Amino acid sequence: MSDILPLDVIGRRVEVNGEYATVRFCGAVPPVAGLWLGVEWDNPERGKHDGSHEGTMYFKCRHPTGGSFVRPSKVNFGDDFLTALKKRYVLEDGPDDDENSCSLKVGSKQVQTIGFEHITKKQSQLRALQDISLWNCAVSHAGEQGRIAEACPNIRVVNLSKNLLSTWDEVVLIAEQLKDLEALDLSENKLQFPSDSPTLTRTFSTLKTLVLNKTGITWTEVLHCAPSWPVLEELYLKSNNISISERPVNVLQKMRLLDLSSNPSIDESQLSLIADLPRLEHLVLSDIGLSSIHFPDAEIGCKTSMFPALKYLIVNDNQISEWSFINELDKLQSLQALSCTRNPLSKADKAEEIIIAKIAQLRTLNRCQILPEERRGAELDYRKAFGNEWRKAGGHPDPDKNRPNAAFLSAHPRYQLLCCKYGAPEDEELKTQQPFMLKKQLLTLKIKCSNQPERQILEKQLPDSMTVQKVKGLLSRLLKVPVSELLLSYESSKMPGREIELENDLQPLQFYSVENGDCLLVRW
């Protein structure tokens, strides 16, 4: 806190009693004597008015209770970069130590060191820093030119989130002294960005990661600044109310990751404007209200030219409720991983299995690896579940008669491919099971490992409608043996010594007349 005001006080970011604000006015507010600062709070509930007092408008606020008048002595205008860095990282003299003793401060931790020369130790400590965090340290400006470069020339990673930086120009003054800067986090600094492209310099020539969450930046401002980021690979723009208004032409061409989450103004049509980024592998679109997506350049069963390198897509917390969304994702030529949690579609029965069946090349779903046997099971279940619908739409096991209508092919683009892969569903598979009491469905079965007689015989209750494939999945988890290696048969309690193979993975236990008290025989 200081009674001396900065020359450029209007627009400065400040902190007052732990709350953040922007200075909008400096001057007298009659009839009360003295100098006042009019501030607009980040939290509008903190304020008292809209910038007016007794009928006179001194400044404007976006919210009717977003403004207050405060005395300059109550306002924290922050520290320069190096002062904040020393407060957090460097040696401080201990009040009771002798002249050869000092205490090392890292965050809030104090570590005593004996016998080191203070100044030399301080300088060497700063020069050794490469990865620093000045989160919430009230950094407001660069300070005297050249001092950062002299004191800490080896810094590569800087977290400056939640500070008092007011303008992009001030960020440039800091960054131009860090010649090896690779990653910079400026989140939660309400920054004023240049309205047109700044003069090209080498300030950010090594920058690969830039985090601008909650900075108030617009897409136009991103594109204005982007020529200064020639090797940028990761850009985070969460919670800025961004709308994508134009294509990034000759900029951001090396970007691999783009986070646009929590920007509700973004819609499906805007995504086409970034679809030509040649190296974009990772796209985060969580919490933007997304409900649909289309790649109009690709027909059913074909691949789109849009997002050619996209491998990882995150669309959590959206309004996705139609399977057509998932169908479209199968058109992406490079997609390997999808996260689609907390969407209306996620609540559908067997939603994850259906997603796996619909997207052929998917390797990871909701951060879980898709094993080959899991994919096979999902595709077989999908083929069976929609078999009757396929038949009604004109599908047929005979290739010469197999002509499902356009509506079915649109809703199930991969169904024909699955029939080619596994064969068309047989009549027996498509018969509807008649419902009956659950108690009658449950079978108490012994499970014996035939080639490992020393293993304890297990006992499990299984529904007789459970398919052989799902029984194998259960046994795979119990025995820690891959599904593909398991062979199943059973021995009837009514016919001791006779072994019956369970050779069709798609058939339920009841198909083989497995009964209560029978013994499943497992080999691998």
Curated annotation (Swiss-Prot):
Protein's UniProt keywords contain Chaperone: yes
Single GO BP term: axonogenesis
Residue positions, PTM N6-acetyllysine: K460
PROSITE patterns with a match to the protein in the record: CAP_GLY_1, CAP_GLY_2
Mapped LRR repeat ranges: 154-175, 180-201, 206-227, 231-253, 254-275, 279-300, 309-330
One Gene Ontology term, aspect cellular component: cytoplasm
Sites of Phosphoserine modification: S492
Record Gene3D superfamilies: CAP Gly-rich-like domain, Phosphatidylinositol 3-kinase Catalytic Subunit, Chain A, domain 1, Ribonuclease Inhibitor
One Pfam family named in its UniProt record: LRR_9
Domain LRRCT: 343-381
Record carries keyword Repressor: no
Tissues expressed in: Ubiquitously expressed.
Protein purpose: Tubulin-folding protein; involved in the second step of the tubulin folding pathway and in the regulation of tubulin heterodimer dissociation. Required for correct organization of microtubule cytoskeleton and mitotic splindle, and maintenance of the neuronal microtubule network.
Similarity section: Belongs to the TBCE family.
Subunit structure: Supercomplex made of cofactors A to E. Cofactors A and D function by capturing and stabilizing tubulin in a quasi-native conformation. Cofactor E binds to the cofactor D-tubulin complex; interaction with cofactor C then causes the release of tubulin polypeptides that are committed to the native state. Cofactors B and E can form a heterodimer which binds to alpha-tubulin and enhances their ability to dissociate tubulin heterodimers. Interacts with TBCD.
Name of the featured protein: Tubulin-specific chaperone E
Taxonomic source organism: Mus musculus
Name of the coding gene: Tbce
